Design a protein with these regions (language model features):
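Glycine-rich phosphate-binding loop of ATP-dependent small-molecule kinases
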Residues: 1-489
């Protein structure tokens, strides 16, 4: 892509100054429309070492209210980031609606650098490319404007800048080992950058190659391209996004009405199995920590189905230093202002740890769908987006265990009445629970569709028959133990 690219003819200085003034004024006005229309803008600034990425960002942000933007310089990974999925450090930095985030280098720089230094196999590189394509598409599908710039300078220009920076003691620190390596292997790096850009150049998030030999000319190209992108985003905001066909292998699942709910276990047998299974799970927890295997256990189910008690029996077997339970309620304002998966990306476990979710990302295709908190296009896209999210976690090495806790309508009513009539349990019942119960049939339809469309081979659903809560607890423990034994051997 770089080899075929031709730089635009640089205008005269007077024209550059006039166009710069116009572009700056335009961006200053557009930022108010971005805030008003709640469009999040992610600007990725990539390019050669010493091409001036930081300087360009510094010039652009002078035209934006400081309350509306954030600049992130993506250096080396932190220890925590090394123990999270590849996209974690980028997903957690996406902007809120109505705001800008500027990334000084990002996922392109990381992938190409790892490839050039032999840290990625061909298979891993291909997976990273696919991850990036999904990530960028999910953002743009959900209303984000993603602008990707590559600042390009010739080999001799880079060498000249390195020499100039190294000559002054106050600037020598700005020359990194990677800058020097790039210049020594310029052709190899150029080929790698070109290949990456070809593979990730998409209509919804194209690459913009910028002639970065002259500072003011570079600034003008970036500003004019950015304002054009914003203009298009403002006019296209309400367009529906085409739905993608599922490409992931699905596991056949029964409808909820087909699940027999007469499963029971005797109290003595329950106590015996509970002790044995919890002891075994405790042993496996130690092993998965040593082998650095991350585990994600996701719970969904009817209100009063017994999710809390089920989670309590699993958590009771674990070392408290190695797991966390996340009760998921309605999103906070800062969560609602971002991509709906953001609050789950930011709660993922480290390698060797367990995250247990009491309610999950599946709220998108249940409560958000039925209560009108998102559009029909949003929740219909979400099945594929969730399958992609879980595939990303699976490819990272996570064990994903998903439970639907099933009861019938009569059992729910019995438990609701018990909660309402027992003072120490009244906190468990809310008006919302009763409202949801009135929509039982609609929820059952949504849950059936959810299970059918998201029970993949790498993250299948497990239905827990929970009219007898003790039976459901033992079944859940058995499944968790079996899944961990498969991975740990």
């Amino acid at each position: 892509m770089l080899q075929e690219w031709k730089a635009m003819e640089k205008p005269e200085e007077e024209e550059i100054r006039a166009r710069l003034a116009a572009a700056k004024e335009k961006l200053a006005k557009q930022q108010l429309l971005i805030k008003e229309q709640k469009i999040p803008v992610l600007v990725l600034m990539e390019g050669w070492g010493t091409a001036g990425k930081g300087s360009v960002i510094g010039q652009v942000i002078q035209n934006i209210d400081p309350r509306f933007f954030k600049v992130e310089s993506m250096g080396e990974k932190s220890e925590e980031e090394c123990r999270k999925p590849f996209l974690y450090r980028y997903f957690r930095r996406i902007p809120e609606e109505g705001k800008f985030v500027f990334l000084d280098s990002g996922w392109m720089d990381e992938i190409v650098k790892d490839e050039l230094h032999g840290k990625l196999s061909d298979e891993d590189y291909a997976k990273r490319i696919e991850s990036v394509r999904r990530f960028e598409r999910q953002l743009t599908d959900n209303g984000y404007l993603v602008m990707k710039f590559f600042l390009h300078i010739p080999e001799k220009e880079q060498a000249k800048r390195i020499e100039h920076l190294e000559h002054e003691k106050d600037t020598v620190w700005r020359v990194s080992k990677n800058d020097l390596w790039q210049n020594r292997h310029y052709e190899k790096c150029e080929e790698a950058f070109s290949s990456y850009m070809k593979n990730t150049n998409m209509p919804s998030a194209p690459w913009y190659i910028i002639d970065a030999k002259s500072r003011k000319w570079t600034e003008l190209q970036v500003l004019e391209t950015l304002t054009q992108g914003i203009e298009i985003a403002l006019s296209n905001q309400k367009l529906a996004v085409p739905l993608l066909q599922n490409v992931f292998p699905l596991v056949p699942m029964p409808l909820l009405s087909e699940v027999p709910l007469d499963k029971e276990i005797e109290t003595d047998e329950y106590r015996k199995e509970l002790k044995e299974l919890q002891n075994r799970l405790g042993e496996l927890h130690n092993r998965l920590y040593r082998k650095k295997v991350p585990v994600i256990i996701a719970y969904e189910g009817w209100d009063a189905a017994g999710k809390g008690g089920n989670i309590k029996r699993i958590a009771g077997a674990l070392d408290p230093r190695g797991y966390e339970v996340y009760p998921i309620a309605s999103p906070e304002p800062h969560e609602k202002a971002r991509h709906y998966l953001w609050r789950f990306w930011t709660r993922l476990p480290k390698t060797g740890h367990i995250a247990i979710f009491d309610r999950t990302w599946y709220g998108r295709v249940m409560v958000e769908r039925l209560e009108g908190f998102c559009s029909e296009n949003d929740w219909m896209r979400a099945y594929n987006e969730i399958n992609e999210f879980e595939k990303e976690l699976h490819d990272w090495g996570a064990v994903i265990i998903k439970f639907w806790v099933q009861i019938d309508k009569d059992t729910q009513l019995e438990r609701f009445n018990e909660r309402q009539n027992t003072p120490e349990k009244q906190w468990k019942i809310t008006d919302e629970d009763w409202r949801n119960r009135d929509k039982w049939d609609a929820y059952e339809t949504a849950v059936n569709e959810m299970i059918q469309k998201t029970s993949t081979s790498y993250a299948p659903w497990h239905i827990l028959e929970s009219v007898d809560k003790k039976y459901a607890r033992i079944k859940a423990l058995k499944i968790v133990v079996e899944e961990l034994e498969k991975v740990l051997g």
